[in-house]
Regions:
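A short glycine-rich, His/Asp/Glu-containing loop-to-beta-strand
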Residues: 27-52, 63, 113
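Short acidic-glycine-tyrosine-enriched beta hairpin
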Residues: 36, 77-95
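Ligand-binding loop in jelly-roll beta-barrel domains
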Residues: 68, 95-116
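Histidine-centered metal-chelating micro-motifs
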Residues: 50-53, 89-101
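Sec/Tat signal peptide C-region and signal peptidase I cleavage site
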Residues: 16-20
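Bacterial N-terminal signal peptides
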Residues: 6-15
Length: 117
């Protein structure tokens, strides 16, 4: 019985994390789908200073910064990167599961273009 409880607990956690990956579903306050077709999905992303997202996943994506800002990203393996962007800056992100946090002093507003193919 002692072995069953941890296995059940881990199984439940895995199911929660697996379902909690789509940013538009787990964090609609920060992610809004503004376009979706079989090739791409475009997310409107907004984070005020100090705001943090829950754990979520993206496929490969292009990020277009509408405003500048400083964002910290912590991946599922615990790696942390901090990036400062300028308005109009474009960047590539490999598919990943992560948490994002606005560690700057201004609201971050960006478009995330997720590639489906």
């Amino acid at each position: 019985m002692k072995k069953v409880i941890p296995i059940v607990g881990i199984s439940i956690l895995v199911m929660i994390v697996a379902k909690a990956q789509d940013p538009a579903k787990v964090d609609p306050a920060h992610y809004k789908v503004i376009f979706n077709n079989p090739q791409v999905r475009v997310l409107d992303v907004r984070l005020k200073p100090g705001e943090k997202t829950p754990v979520h996943s993206h496929p490969n994506l292009v990020v277009y910064s509408l405003t500048g800002g400083t964002i910290k990203s912590t991946t599922a393996d615990g790696k942390t990167t901090t990036v400062t962007t300028k308005p109009g800056q474009v960047g590539w992100r490999n598919a990943q599961t992560h948490i994002s946090e606005n560690v700057g002093k201004t609201e971050i507003h960006a478009l995330g273009i997720e590639l489906k193919r």
